[in-house]
Amino acid sequence: MGYKEIYNEWLTNAYFDADTKAELERIASDENEIKERFYTDLEFGTAGLRGIIGAGTNRMNIYTVRKATQGLANYILKSGNAEKGVAIAFDSRRMSPEFAQEAACCLAANGIKAYVFDSLRPTPELSYAVRKLECIAGINITASHNPPEYNGYKVYWEDGAQITPPHDKGIMDEVKAVTDYTTMKTMPAEDAKAAGLYEVIGAEVDDAYIAELKKQVIHQDAIDAVGKDLKIVYSPLHGTGNIPARRILKELGFENVYVVKEQELPDGEFPTVSYPNPEAAEAFELGLKLAREVDADIVLATDPDADRLGVRVKDKNGEYHDLTGNMSGCLLADYEIGQRSALRGLPEDGYLIKTIVTTNMADAIADYYNTGLIEVLTGFKYIGQQILGFETSKKGEYLFGFEESYGCLIGTHARDKDAIVATMALCEAAAYYKTKDMTLWDAMIEMYERYGYYKDDIQSITLKGIEGLAKIQEILETLRKNPPTEIAGYKVLKARDYKADTIQDMQTGEVSSTGLPTSNVLYYDLSDDAWLCVRPSGTEPKVKFYYGIKGTSLSDADEKSAAMGKEVLAMIDKIM
């Protein structure tokens, strides 16, 4: 059927509820809007679903959630592990509780038990719950840091990580095979509960999760010594982090935690920010205002699903510095690996894991501590996959993993990035350095002096709709057919094409495999430890240009990064 026929089917079929039909009636005269909503199904990709909330096959609604869940249920039933059940969590967004219940009711109608959190919870706790409850899978209703009109649906497998091969393709195929909405199963929530197929979970999982985080503390002595003096400003950005982040800090002994009141309570409209993203300066405006009032040492903000952490740290002159995800990740990697090395030594087969778009300072840290370094595709699920590989092969030990987009994992209690454990560890590190009369900024400067003045940045273009998607593909194909030989004065040493699974040495012409799964990503290794990577976003209508350089000082790094940024923008303009 064409999009107009599908639109009419949704308008007239008794299966669809009155609110859905009323919403569709309101767009009856808007042909473009009808087409956008019905020209395709909302794609269930490797990251699950993510889209604008609304009626239509290309929108997030109870029917597209039911379709995704029916496909997942079919896959689970074929796997033979349906009796293990599925854990379900949700965030503070519009319709998140409703979508979580819809998923649970669909699973129950298929004979699969759902364990549903009683209220909003962080993404990492869902990952932990899958493992703790020994479920076959997990569902998380969240769109992370997207604008308020979005919501999403992420699927986790039994190891607690987001789905990777072969499960991702298997589930995607099952979801695609569900073509008739009226055949999808569901049942009333009360009936599911009465049948023992819908169990509400909460405090017992919270307590176990917090206990796991506490196991990662290295220097409780430092917290005991100065934790009561350290001043911390924290914002959950209207999301899920408020209760667990403040709980862990209080229980460890951090007494001066100031929450940003305007952003404390869950609110899917995110009224104080246009974009609830801890990478954005806007997200810190209220936090920094409070920090200056109370003279805080550090300012922290977690994104709405509390898997990513933004950081500002105060130097000894009272100035606050923004730590990018690369900087905070390296600060934590150096602290965690360095302190464990000093206290009890490191395992011979220990590994630091990073994504391909993450700073090369990580490589320098791994070299310094003589640990292995593993590079994976963008997406924390690939770090989770490596941890599973260590466990199943009994070879290799996880030390730390992070990605440039403000996410890391300390410990293996979860298999997704965890901003609650990161909040805990960063405050612990601040306490430790405070006992040495150092700030976190002092520690960062010390790292630059030891490893090099690395600076990394990103430029992105937003291209929405059908035409935008085509343009994004055109940009990648143009670069693929005409690879640059020089970028911003840096020679291209190697060109990696993850879609073609090739690494070409630009000097010798030799071609080798990337050793990673195929992905529509281009990467250029440049001279002087610089690099550039181009990839479409997996969650937003964007194409992203990541790049990094290494300078001889902070000012030199700033200059080189600015020059690289200008060159990247010029490249984009030329292609566009």
Label the model's feature ranges.
Residues 33-42, 151-285, 290-291:
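Gly/Ser/Thr-enriched, mixed-charge loops and adjacent short helices
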Residues 5-103, 192-228, 240:
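An N-terminal, well-structured beta->alpha segment
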Residues 292, 296-298, 319-321, 339-535, ...:
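Phosphate-binding and adjacent anionic-ligand microenvironments
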Residues 156-186, 326-349, 354-362, 419, ...:
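Glycine-rich phosphate-binding loop plus the immediately following alpha-helix
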Residues 87-150, 250-310:
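N-terminal small/polar loop signature for handling phosphorylated ligands or for N-terminal nucleophile
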Residues 38-58, 143-146, 232, 236-248, ...:
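Conserved phosphate/anionic-ligand binding catalytic regions in large, soluble enzymes, centered on
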Residues 99-107, 150-157, 307-326, 362-365:
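Short Gly/Thr/Asp-enriched flexible loops that form oxyanion-binding sites at enzyme active sites
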